[in-house]
Amino acid sequence: MIQHDQRTAVWRRLGTNVIGLTPAEALAKAGADYEVGIVPLVASVPDTLVSAVAGQEMSVAKRVPRKNLTYRLDNGEPIAPVGARYHVVQTKEVLSLVEAMTGAGWQPEFAGTFNNNSAVFMAGKMDMALKTREIDPYLCFVNSFDGSTGVKFACTPFRPFCTNQIRAIFTKRGERPVISLRHTTHILKRADTARELLGLTTAYYRYMDEQVERLLDKVLTEQMLSQALDIVAPIKQDAPDFVRERKEQKRAMLVHTLRTSPTIEDRDRDSAWGLYNAMTELEQWNRDQFPTQAQAEKMFGNHLGMVPMTNPSDRMLRVLTAPYFG
C-alpha cells in the first residue's frame, strides 16, 4: 500500500499550483487557456478501385455524416469527434461565472488539463467551516470539448488525513450535487447559475457534515462489522476455495486497515466512519505503485461525474447509513 505521507491528491497530480492567482491567470499558468475550433470530421478510407489500378493501397477523404471534430486553435492538435449540433463554449466565455464563485469564497488551488486536452479544470476549497473537520469542501470547475459534459461545477469532498477523494458520498439520491451546463448557445444566458451553484454547494456540504457526525457517533459492533463485510465481500456457501480465500483476504485486509491505519484516529476505529474510511483507503491506495497518468485521469473523471454508487466503498456507505443498520 502507498504510505499516507507519499500520497497526492489527484488534482495536484494532474494540475499546476495556482494559489493566489485570478482564474484567468490560473488558466494561463496551467496552459489551459487555449481556444478550441470545430470543423467537419473527414476520414481517410480505402479506395478499392484506384488501389486496384495503382497496384497499391490508396485512400480518399470522405466527410463523416453528422460528425464534427474539435481541435486546438493554437497548435491545430485534434481533440475529439463530436456531434454535428455540438457548440463549443470557450473557457474564457465562462470566466465571469468562475470569478463569481471566487467572489463567494472559492479559491482555485490547482488547474490543468486531462484526457488529451479534451477538458480543462480548476480545483479549490470553499471558504466554509465544517463542524467535524473531517472533510475539506473542494469544488471543481470543468469545461470539456469532447461532448462528454458541458461546463460543470462538481463537489469533490477530500479527506486530508488520508488524501482520499470521496466519491458520491452522503447524498439522498446517490448523486453528488453537480451543475452541468451543456454546450449550447443558451449556456451563457443563465445569470442565476452562480447563485444556484453556491446554494447547492453549501447545502451539500452542510448535509454531508451532519452525516459524517452521525457515522462518527455510530459505534461499530462486531455484528455490524460482520454485516458490512457481508455486503462488500460476500462469500457464497458454494463458492470455490480460491474464491473464498480471495474474499477472506479482502475482509481481513479491511479489518487490519481499520485497526492499524495511521490515517484513522484511535477514537474512530470503533465507529462507522472509521470503517468507511478504511474501505476508501484500500480502494484508492492499496497498490504497489502510484497510478499512471491514464489511471489518475480516469479516477478524476469518476469523482467529477454524476454516477450511481457502485464501488465497494459506495456499497459500504449505503449499508452504514441505512436506517436498519446498527
Predicted regions and their residues:
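Intrinsically disordered, low-complexity regions enriched in serine/threonine
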Residues: 1-52, 128-326
